[in-house]
Amino acid sequence: MALRIWASSTAKALRLSSASRPHFSPLFRCFSSAAVLDGLKYANSHEWVKHEGSVATIGITDHAQDHLGEVVFVELPEVGGSVTKATGFGAVESVKATSDVNSPISGEIVEVNSKLTKTPGLINKSPYEDGWMIKVKPSNPSELDSLMGPKEYTKFCEEEGAAAH
């Protein structure tokens, strides 16, 4: 009986504390739980690109990591190698599946996120910041023009989700 009273009061306290906190959400969302950030470009294979100066940072989207589940291993390419648009450069292994990661653009790999080797879960915790995968010097910057902006990617995800049901 005491356990039931404790559980009831704890549940009530949790409802009250979560109801009183302000709710912050990203600018865009694919589904109710997947963030889509402004200022990035997106591929229909669910990778993102952040182009700054002569370097483009690439990773998988929040939508992709959400569908994969807990990431347990990341395969990354070598610095100095090259990537080709729409071609695989690595893989992400989760508790659910292993997925190839495609490059949204072509170019030379100038940096890889070596933190992912020891802490692959960074992709789940921070797909757009700490969970980036590679940095590339684009060989054809105009390829960025063929990628989706945040609004287009959000619509793409919604349509993809509707088609799956």
UniProtKB/Swiss-Prot annotation:
Residue stretches spanning the membrane: none
Annotated keywords: Lipoyl, Mitochondrion, Transit peptide
Tissue specificity: Expressed in roots, stems and leaves.
InterPro entries reported in the protein's UniProt record: 2-oxoA_DH_lipoyl-BS, Biotin_lipoyl, GCV_H, GCV_H/Fam206, GCV_H_sub, Single_hybrid_motif
Record carries keyword Transmembrane: no
Modified-residue entries (N6-lipoyllysine), positions: 96
Family matches, as CDD domains: GCS_H
The protein's required cofactors: (R)-lipoate
Main location: mitochondrion
Any one GO biological process: glycine decarboxylation via glycine cleavage system
Subunit description: The glycine cleavage system is composed of four components that only loosely associate: the P protein (EC 1.4.4.2), the T protein (EC 2.1.2.10), the L protein (EC 1.8.1.4) and the lipoyl-bearing H protein.
Stated family: Belongs to the GcvH family.
NCBIfam families reported in the protein's UniProt record: gcvH, PRK01202.1
Function comment: The glycine cleavage system catalyzes the degradation of glycine. The H protein shuttles the methylamine group of glycine from the P protein to the T protein.
UniProt-recorded name of the protein: Glycine cleavage system H protein, mitochondrial
Organism encoding this protein: Flaveria trinervia (Clustered yellowtops)
